[in-house]
Amino acid sequence: MQIEERIVEGHLLAARTTPGNTRRISFAKITEPLEVPQLLSLQTDSFDWLVGNDKWNAAVERRRSEGEDVSSKSGLQEIFEEISPIEDFSETMSLSFENPVFYDPKYTVDECKEKDFTYSAPLYVSAEFTNNDTGEIKGQTVFMGDFPLMTDKGTFIINGTERVVVSQLVRSPGVYFERTADKTSDKDIYTAKLIPSRGAWLEFEIDKRDMVGVRLDRKRKQNVTVLLKALGWTNEQIREEFGEYESMMLTLEKDHTQGQDDALLDIYRKLRPGEPPTREAAQTLLNNYYFNPKRYDLAKVGRYKINKKLGLLEAFDQQTLTIDDVVAAIKYIVALHDGREQIEAPQGTLDISADDIDHFGNRRMRTVGELIQNQLRTGLARMERVVRERMTTQDVEAITPQSLINIRPVVAALKEFFGTSQLSQFMDQTNPIAGLTHKRRLSALGPGGLSRDRAGMEVRDVHPSHYGRMCPIETPEGPNIGLIGSLASYGRINPFGFVETPYRKVTKGKVTDQIDYLTADDEDRYVIAQANAALDDKSRFVEERVLVRQRDGEVSEVLADEVDYMDVSPRQMVSVATALIPFLEHDDANRALMGANMQRQAVPLIKSDSPLVGTGIEYRAAVDAGDVVVATAAGVVKEVSADVIETMNDDGTYSTYRLAKFKRSNQGTCINQRPLVSEGDRLEIGTPIADGPCTDEAEMALGTNLLVAFMPWQGHNYEDAIILSQRLVQEDILTSIHIEEHEVDARDTKLGPEEITRDIPNVSEEMLADLDERGIIRIGAEVTTGDVLVGKVTPKGETELTPEERLLRAIFGEKAREVRDTSMKVPHGESGTVIGVRVFDREDGDELPPGVNQLVRVYVAQKRKISVGDKLAGRHGNKGVIAKILPIEDMPFMEDGTPVDVVLNPLGVPRRMNIGQILELHLGWLAKQGWDLNLNDDKSGADWKQRLIKIHADKAEPGTKVATPVFDGAREDEITGLLGSTIPNRDGVRMIDNTGKASLFDGRSGEPFPEPVAVGYMYILKLHHLVDDKIHARSTGPYSMITQQPLGGKAQFGGQRFGEMEVWAMEAYGAAYALQELLTIKSDDVPGRVKVYEAIVKGENIPDSGIPESFKVLVKEMQSLCLNVEVLSQDGTAIEMRDAEEDVFRAAEELGIDLSRREPSSVEEV
C-alpha cells in the first residue's frame, strides 16, 4: 500500500516538470496545429542516413508503408556501390565492396572528452576479389578505419574537443537560364548553364548578333550547331527541329563544319589547342566530359531539377547528360530569346521564364551526411588508384582483398575534413542556445560555396522564398552578413536537400488540419494566407477577403475560396533564437538581429532564472538543445544525488543518468547539471529530470529578471552606459563561474627526459607550499598570477667543468644536475581556485602522443562577480557597458522603499526603435505583481477584456510567468488595461499607475524626481565580453624582431600603441621629454632600455636616450632603394649607425635580462 501511495504522490510531483504543463500564462490567440519539430533533426537525420542505422531504417519503413517512394540505400552503401567494381587496366581482375557494418565504439563519449580521443566506431566492409580469367572469387571482411560518430546532441568529438559540422547552402545542380542586358547595345543577352554536381559545365549563350553559341568547360565559345553535329545530328535534323527559330537558322548558316567527324575535330581543337586532333580522341574527350558516369554526375537532385525545368521524363538514375537534355536546353533558350511564353515538352506544355539564382528553389543544403559522403568519395577515389596499381604489380595467385586495399587515404580524408575543413567548427558552447543555433546554422561559405569577397549584395539579401526556411533576422553583423543564416523553426530538409516548410491545406475556404510540406518552387504555385487570418469555430475564414501572398510573391487580398494554403504558426518565418525575443513585432529588424545574436553570448549565471516574460518556446529550446537531462524510459525515481539519478523503469529494468558537475565548456563557461526530481517521483518518457547551464525548471534561462528604471542619472548613463545596484554584486545575482584548463607535458628531449617534480632549482619553499609530493598543485588551492601549478625541470646542455669541479666530482661521484625550471605557472591576469587535476602517465598504460611521458591538466575556476566594464544586454539589441555600481542606498527607490536594480538611459530607445523592451518592462511588472480583472475600475466589457477572458488570462498570482509569442503576443491595449488591474501591495497601494510609470525618489537626497519614471521588470543578460578578460598591463615583455618595438595585444603580452595622434597631443602640450621617453627608451631604443633598467635598479639618474631601432630600419629601407642616406651630427660629420654596444650586453647579463631578439612562438612563452 505504501509503495502505491509513493507512486501516486510521485505522479503528482512529476507533474510540475512534465511537458505541456508549464506555469506560463500565454497571450497567444492562435492555436497551432503543429508542434515545433525536433530542433536537432537537421543534424541527426542526415547522419542517420549516412550510416544507415536502425532509426533511419525504421523511418524508411514507415514512409514506405505510407506509400512514399524512398530509397533504402544508406549514404555509405551508395558510395561503396558507386566505386564497385574496381577493375585493373586489362579488366581481368575486379574488386567490389558491399554491406558496410559498424562495430561498437571503443570508448564512451565522456572517455573520449577526458582522454583526447575521437569518438568513433570501426567500419568493416565485405570485399570480393574476382579473377575474371579463372572465375575465382575471394571474399574477406576488411577494416576501413575508425569512422567518427555523431553524439546524441548532434556533435562530433574529435581529439577530445566537441565540434559541429555546419550545413552548407550551395547552388543546386540543374539547368539555369539568365537574361542580362548588353552594355554596348540595348539588346538582351541570354545564357543557359547546365551545372552538374561534379564534372564540366555546359553553357549556351545567345549574343547581341542573335548567334547561339556554346562553351564546353568554360573554354572558348563555338557555334551550338557544331556541338549538335558532333552528337550525331545532321543539318536536316537541325532544320527540322529548330526551323522556326531565326537565331538557330542564322547560326547554322555561319557554321561551315561538314558532318560529325569535322565537328568533333573542331571541338577538339578548341578544347585541346596544340594537340594533334584525331576522331577517336575527340569522341572520347566529348564522352568523358558529359556522358561518362565516372567523370560527370548530375546527382539525383540535378536530374530532378533538369526534368522539372525542361519538362523531360528521364529516369532518376540517369545521372549523366543525354542528347535529349542538350536539345531541350537549346530549345528552351532559343524560345526564351524569341519571346515565347510556352513550349511543348514530353511532360506537357511548359511555361518559359528566366531563373532567379537566389531563389531557395535553386539553392540546396549539403547537410552533415552529404559533406562526409563527399569527403569519403575523395578518399575512396585515391584508394582506387592504389588498388589498380597493386593489381598489376602483385602475383595473381597471392592476391587477397586485404592485400590490395590501403585504407590510409580514406582515413586521411576523414581526418582532414573533421580537423581542417571550414565547415567543421569548434562548437560554440557559451550557453545552450549558442550550441543549438550553431547546429542549425546554414553557411554559404566553405569549399564549393561562395567567398566573402566575391559575394554581392543580391546573395546576401533577404529573399521572399526564405519565408519559413531561413530566418530573415538572425545573421552575423560584419563581413559574413547574409552569407550565414539560421534554419527557421519549422523548416526541414527533404531528400533532395531543399528546405521545406509546412502549410495547412485550405479547401473551399475551410482550413483543414492536413499539413503539407512545400519547397520554395512548389510554394510559388499557390495562394497562401497568413497564420493570423481570423477563423470561426468551423475553421472557416471570418472575412470574405483574405490577405494572402500571391503566386508571384506579391501581397494582395483575394476571396476566401481562392486560398490554397495557410501558415501553420506566426513564428514559422523566424529561427529559434529570434523566436525567444518577446514583442519581436515591435522591434526594428536591425536591433532584433543584435538581440538574437547577443542571446548566444550570454554566460550561464550561478542562479538561473527563467524570464518573467517569455515567448513559450523556452521549454522546447532548452530540452532539444540537449543540456537538460530527460527520462528515456517511463518509471519511478529510485535514488537522487548531485551527480547521479537512478530510476526503476516500468519494464523492471534500471536506468542511470550521470550529471555533469562543473565541467569546462569550449568557451570556458561552466557546465553544471542539477537534479529536478525527488525520490519516488513518477517519470514519463521525455520528462526533464535535471537542469543544465542556463536552464530553470527545463526552460531556457539565459539571464535574470531585474527591476529597471528608464531615467538619466547624473550623466553616468550617457550613451548606453548602465548603472547597477550593489545588491547584484552582494547577492551574486549576476555572478558566473569560468573555468580555465592549463596543460603541461613532460617529453623526451635530446638532452634527456623532462621530469615533473617538486624539486625545482632556485624556488623558495613558500612558492611550493601548495604542491604535493609529485610537484602538482593540490585541489582547493587559491592561485594567482605567477604561482606554480605543476613543477617541471628540463635538462640543460652539459657545460665545460673547471678542474676543481672535476676533482670534487671524482671524489664524491656526485654529478651536479644541470636542469632549468620549466614549470607551468598561472598566466598573466588569471587567478582562481584549483578544482580539478588530471594526470596521464605512459607507465600507467595511458595512450599519449609519441615523445610524451606524462601529461598533467589543471582546472582553475573563477567566480566572477559583475563589475564596472562588463557588458550587459536585453533581448532587443539594447546593449551597454556598466559605468557605475551604486550602493543600494543611493539607487532611486519607489514609494514603498523598493530600490531599483538597474538604471538605463531612456534616450537609447526612440532612435533605435526597439520598443519591445518598453512593452517587456510593463508586462514584466504585471507578471511580478499579478493581476485580477475584477480589480479594474473600467466596468465596460472592453474588447481587450473579452480577449483575455477567452484565453483564460483574466487572473494571475504574483510572480506568474507569462508567454507572449512572436507576432501573436500581448497587445498594447491589453497591457494598458492590465496595468489598471494589478494586485496592490500589502498597504493597498499600487506603485505603478495605468501609464506604467512610478514616482521615484533620489536615494541620496530623499527628494522625489520631478517626473514619473517608467519602471518594471526586464530580462537582462550578462554577455561573454567581460572586463577581466580584456584588461591588461605590461611591464617588460617580448619585442618585435625587426623594429624592436613591443608587440601588441593581450595575447602577446604586448604594450599600448602610442600612435600618430597621441604624439600630436603631446607635441601640442609641449611635453617634449615625456614624448622622447615614449618614442625611445620605452619603445625601441635597445641600449637605452637596458641602461634605464640598470639605472632604476641601481637608483641612479635616467641616462639620455639614443637612436630608436625603427629609425635604423627606415635608413636601411631607404638604402635598399638605392638612396644614400647619412645621419649627420651638429658639426656636419657623419654618425656611424652601430649596433648595440658591448657594455649593453654586459649590463644585460648582470641584470638577468634576455636580449636575444626573437618573437615568442606561443602565448605560454609570454
UniProtKB/Swiss-Prot annotation:
Q: Which UniProt keywords apply?
A: DNA-directed RNA polymerase, Nucleotidyltransferase, Transcription, Transferase
The UniProt record lists the EC number as: 2.7.7.6
Q: What's an example of a GO molecular-function annotation for this chain?
A: ribonucleoside binding
Q: Does the keyword Ubl conjugation apply?
A: no
The Gene Ontology CC terms held by the record are: DNA-directed RNA polymerase complex
The superkingdom listed in its UniProt entry is: Bacteria
Q: Which InterPro entries does this one have?
A: DNA-dir_RNA_pol_bsu_ext_1_sf, DNA-dir_RNA_pol_bsu_external_1, DNA-dir_RNA_pol_su2, DNA-dir_RNAP_su2_dom, DNA-dir_RNAP_su2_hyb_sf, RNA_pol_bsu_bac, RNA_pol_bsu_CS, RNA_pol_bsu_protrusion
Q: Which GO terms describe its biological process?
A: DNA-templated transcription
Family matches, as Pfam families: RNA_pol_Rpb2_1, RNA_pol_Rpb2_2, RNA_pol_Rpb2_3, RNA_pol_Rpb2_45, RNA_pol_Rpb2_6, RNA_pol_Rpb2_7
Subunit structure, interactors included = The RNAP catalytic core consists of 2 alpha, 1 beta, 1 beta' and 1 omega subunit. When a sigma factor is associated with the core the holoenzyme is formed, which can initiate transcription.
**Family under the similarity heading:** Belongs to the RNA polymerase beta chain family.
Biological role: DNA-dependent RNA polymerase catalyzes the transcription of DNA into RNA using the four ribonucleoside triphosphates as substrates.
The protein's name: DNA-directed RNA polymerase subunit beta
**Which species?**
Nocardioides sp. (strain ATCC BAA-499 / JS614)
